[in-house]
């Protein structure tokens, strides 16, 4: 009976394997979902399996918790505005050290441990991400004021040629969110927003944001308030009502941006759920919150 059940589970995945065969799926691997060792193993196995059944995962990773720890060790206090890290020159060097120097290589090694072929990149590789300094505005006393985030960028252009070559050669690209401006200066990119831009440029079928929450909820402390499916207009209403704040704001911005650029659906899932990526792609009910245009 147990063997029959296993076979049924495999057969349930068949329509989705057919549907998404040779499609690109952008996986945004969030900082908080990378802390748990078991969760890291689940995600790596999921991505390798996707590749072997003919689906093309592309990874963009963050690293917020490890960046925070590195900053604190160096006597710096992390500062955020609307979920975006304020980045001076010293902070940018720490960000690059952690993202490019440590986390990217760790993810590549984990994927290769489970039989995948992976290549670590940053937005600097092959002029992958051209960026410009981000101008951030806040409302204060009913007035719009400009806030200086420092060396924080936003994506101007994604050159997909290098990613296309790697995908064609059966590699899993793993991308650190560091961009370069037209003067050759490095800029810190929010990983969620960069993932949305890359997903759109790559014509990805899905963007899956792996984080440490179950999805979009009215009350983060009450799992029963989880939304299984939302449209852009519904999300915009939640922002207006103050139900979406802090670090979830860049995720939502990335969702909307990716959908506007042609991605069919965006999914926010909890990386601490065993094999969340496989459950999202290969089961009828999926997991987390799905966001669609309308």
Swiss-Prot record:
Q: Where in the cell is it found?
A: Cytoplasm
What is the taxonomic lineage of the source species?
Archaea, Methanobacteriati, Methanobacteriota, Methanomada group, Methanococci
Query: What is the official name of this protein in its record?
Result: Acetylglutamate kinase
List GO molecular-function terms, semicolon-separated.
acetylglutamate kinase activity; ATP binding
GO cellular component, alphabetical, reads: cytoplasm
Recorded hits in InterPro entries, A to Z, give: AceGlu_kinase-like_sf (IPR036393), AcgluKinase_fam (IPR004662), ArgB (IPR037528), Asp/Glu/Uridylate_kinase (IPR001048), Glu/AcGlu_kinase (IPR001057), NAGK-C (IPR041727)
- Function description: Catalyzes the ATP-dependent phosphorylation of N-acetyl-L-glutamate.
| GO BP term, pick one | L-arginine biosynthetic process
Record's catalysed reaction(s): N-acetyl-L-glutamate + ATP = N-acetyl-L-glutamyl 5-phosphate + ADP
Q: Name one Pfam family in it.
A: AA_kinase
EC number annotated for this UniProt entry: 2.7.2.8
């Amino acid at each position: 009976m147990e063997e029959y059940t296993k076979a049924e589970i495999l057969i349930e995945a068949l329509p989705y394997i057919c549907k998404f065969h040779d499609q690109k799926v952008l996986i945004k691997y969030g900082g908080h979902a990378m802390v748990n060792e078991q969760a890291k193993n689940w995600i790596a196995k999921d991505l390798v399996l996707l590749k072997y059944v003919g689906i093309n995962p592309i990874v963009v990773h963050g690293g917020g918790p490890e960046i925070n720890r590195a900053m604190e060790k160096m006597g710096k206090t992390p500062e955020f505005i609307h979920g975006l890290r304020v980045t001076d020159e010293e902070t940018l060097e720490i960000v690059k050290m952690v993202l490019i120097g440590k986390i990217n290589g760790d993810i590549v090694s984990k994927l290769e441990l489970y039989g995948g072929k992976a290549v670590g990149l940053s937005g600097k590789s092959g002029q992958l991400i051209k960026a410009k300094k981000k101008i951030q505005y806040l409302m204060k006393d009913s007035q719009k004021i400009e806030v200086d985030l420092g060396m924080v960028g936003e994506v101007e252009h994604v050159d997909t040629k290098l990613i296309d070559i790697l995908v064609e050669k059966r590699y899993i690209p793993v991308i650190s969110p560091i961009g370069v401006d037209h003067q050759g200066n490095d800029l810190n990119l929010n990983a969620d927003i960069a993932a949305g831009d890359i997903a759109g440029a790559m014509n990805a079928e899905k963007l899956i944001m792996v984080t440490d929450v179950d999805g979009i909820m009215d009350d983060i402390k009450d799992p029963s308030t989880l939304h299984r499916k939302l449209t852009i207009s519904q999300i915009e209403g939640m922002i207006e009502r103050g139900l979406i704040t802090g670090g979830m704001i860049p995720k939502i911005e990335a969702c909307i941006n990716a959908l506007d650029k042609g991605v069919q659906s965006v999914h926010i899932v909890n990386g601490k759920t065993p094999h969340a990526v496989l459950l999202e792609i290969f089961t009828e009910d999926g997991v987390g919150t799905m966001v669609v245009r309308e």
